Amino acid sequence: MGNGMNKILTGLFLGNFKDARDVEQLHKNNITHILSIHDSARPMLEGMKYLCIPASDSPSQNLIQHFKDSIAFIHECRLKGEGCLVHCLAGVSRSVTLVVAYVMTVTDFGWEDSLSAVRGARTCANPNMGFQKQLEDFGKCEVHHFRTWLKDTYGESTFHDKDEAKQLLDKHKQQEAAESQNATSSGRQWNSHLTSLSSRSYSNYTTET
């Protein structure tokens, strides 16, 4: 959460409150637009274009109502060849939800694959359960209309979003496989250690006859 902003797609970055004030990082990544979503979201830096959404990290907080404005803000920035940073406080829940909704709209990914793709770039990404349910509902009811609206409004995309998202999704799957393998290996080592201790304990309490 504190290792700097992460690139999700060309021109789209995800980070935390600290990243949104890090002028060096912002300049390095050509950030000109900042989408800020947290309880006291407000513009902080001169020369930046802001979309500020006051919202709490509560499962009952309605974020779907902000998806269209957020998607348009991000997309218009990217079409200019500039960078957009989406952030909340920790860059874990609220901002991730908006970014996942955007990824769903510019690809044909469902919400789970879109979230996994985001996690491929930012491992701490973890929207609360209420936000995950909203993403699921968005995928069932609204995303198809949003894809049509985006195409009708901005034309055919020249980005390679699906390919970039697929690379992140594959990266996440590799990370999960490595973690699973490490956990299995650790479990075997622990079981071996317990067996060794048990054998020693038994030998200490037995005598030859």
UniProtKB/Swiss-Prot annotation:
Keywords: Cytoplasm, Hydrolase, Nucleus, Protein phosphatase. It is found in: Cytoplasm; Nucleus. Residues 177-190 have a biased composition (Polar residues). Residues 169-192 are annotated as: Disordered. It comes from the Eukaryota. GO terms for molecular function: protein serine/threonine phosphatase activity; protein tyrosine phosphatase activity. SMART domains: DSPc. Pfam families: DSPc. Belongs to the protein-tyrosine phosphatase family. Non-receptor class dual specificity subfamily. Disulfide bonds: none annotated. The keyword Signal does not apply. The active site is at 88 (phosphocysteine intermediate). This is Dual specificity protein phosphatase 22. SUPFAM superfamilies: (Phosphotyrosine protein) phosphatases II. Activates the Jnk signaling pathway. Dephosphorylates and deactivates p38 and stress-activated protein kinase/c-Jun N-terminal kinase (SAPK/JNK). Its main location: cytoplasm. It catalyses: O-phospho-L-tyrosyl-[protein] + H2O = L-tyrosyl-[protein] + phosphate; O-phospho-L-seryl-[protein] + H2O = L-seryl-[protein] + phosphate; O-phospho-L-threonyl-[protein] + H2O = L-threonyl-[protein] + phosphate. The lineage of its organism: Eukaryota, Metazoa, Chordata, Craniata, Vertebrata. Residues 4-144 form the Tyrosine-protein phosphatase domain. GO terms for biological process: signal transduction. GO terms for cellular component: cytosol; nucleus.
